[in-house]
């Protein structure tokens, strides 16, 4: 156990908190753009086997970084003690790729897999994009956590765009709307977590997806709405709001795809 504690102390390195649009933030944004362009140019028309491999590799990377985060946030290097903080349990909106990407990688071709693909290019992409553009309080003094959060959210953006480009021929109203089904199912699971957490560990204020009926939402805009209306109404607005943004992303993606096809036809 002492060896494990020492090992964690070595990887739990602290330094200055990165600034919003400081050198570290800008570097991460630049790498995100560069890698997105590279993947689109190199693999936009790759076969399904290669596509699945890339999804799987991405999932493994973010899973390893998430495991690191869970260990570091649970260990107190000063006292050498362990305590799991359920606040860090990976079932938030931006954690969804941890659970969605395996379905994209392993499910057989069909409508169910398409729903997870659609979710990845819309809901998951949106979650990553928001944090990449405005990290807010995700930056902290722990160097490893800062790397983890940028790798994770950048992966959401990169995979969101890459998946959209690679799966562009599937674009349709039904394909896009299927993402809402996945989102609603995940939110339902999150609510279940929140209810159980309120019963078993009320002192930790568990609030997965910031949508629970017991703890006020901490999300921008939603934090203002939450205390003003009954929770069921808040939940409906929450699902509708996120779905509206996701469908807007799908609409923009489809516009780009249609324009690209027209340009190709003119060139031909």
Regions inferred by a protein language model and the residue ranges of each:
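N-terminal topogenic module of multi-pass integral membrane proteins
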Residues: 1-53
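Membrane-interface transmembrane-helix boundary segments in multi-pass integral membrane proteins
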Residues: 13-30, 176-181, 199-249
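Membrane-embedded alpha-helical segments of multi-pass membrane proteins
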Residues: 26-32, 90-100, 120, 150-158
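Alpha-helical transmembrane segments in multipass membrane proteins, preferentially the mid-helix core
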Residues: 34-39, 100-103, 155-176, 188
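Membrane-interface helix-boundary motifs at transmembrane edges
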Residues: 41-54, 107-116, 166-177
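Juxtamembrane "helix-exit" motif on the non-cytosolic side of transmembrane helices
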Residues: 67-79, 131-141, 196
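Non-cytosolic membrane-interface motifs at loop->transmembrane helix junctions
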Residues: 78-91, 141-151
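Membrane-proximal helix-loop-helix units in multi-pass membrane proteins
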Residues: 103-160, 164
């Amino acid at each position: 156990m002492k060896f494990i504690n020492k090992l964690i102390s070595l990887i739990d390195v602290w330094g200055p908190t990165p600034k919003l649009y400081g050198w570290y933030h800008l570097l991460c944004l630049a790498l995100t753009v560069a890698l997105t362009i590279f993947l689109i140019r190199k693999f936009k028309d790759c076969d399904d086997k290669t596509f699945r491999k890339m999804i799987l590799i991405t999932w493994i990377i973010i899973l390893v970084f998430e495991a690191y985060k869970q260990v570091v946030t649970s260990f107190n290097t000063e006292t050498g003690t362990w305590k799991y903080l359920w606040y860090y349990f990976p079932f938030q909106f931006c954690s969804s790729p941890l659970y969605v990407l395996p379905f994209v990688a392993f499910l057989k071709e069909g409508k169910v897999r398409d729903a997870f693909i659609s979710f990845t290019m819309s809901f998951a992409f949106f979650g990553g994009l928001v944090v990449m553009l405005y990290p807010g309080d995700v930056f902290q003094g722990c160097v490893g956590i800062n790397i983890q959060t940028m790798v994770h959210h950048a992966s959401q953006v990169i995979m969101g765009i890459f998946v959209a480009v690679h799966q562009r021929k599937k674009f349709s109203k039904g394909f896009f709307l299927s993402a809402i089904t996945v989102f609603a199912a995940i939110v339902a699971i999150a609510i279940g977590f929140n209810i159980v957490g309120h019963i078993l560990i009320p002192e930790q204020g568990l609030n997965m997806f910031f949508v629970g009926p017991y703890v006020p939402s901490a999300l921008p805009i939603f934090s203002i709405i939450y205390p003003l209306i009954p929770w069921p109404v808040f939940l409906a607005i929450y699902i509708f709001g996120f779905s509206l943004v996701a469908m807007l992303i799908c609409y923009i993606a489809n516009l780009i795809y249609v324009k690209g096809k027209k340009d190709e036809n003119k060139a031909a």
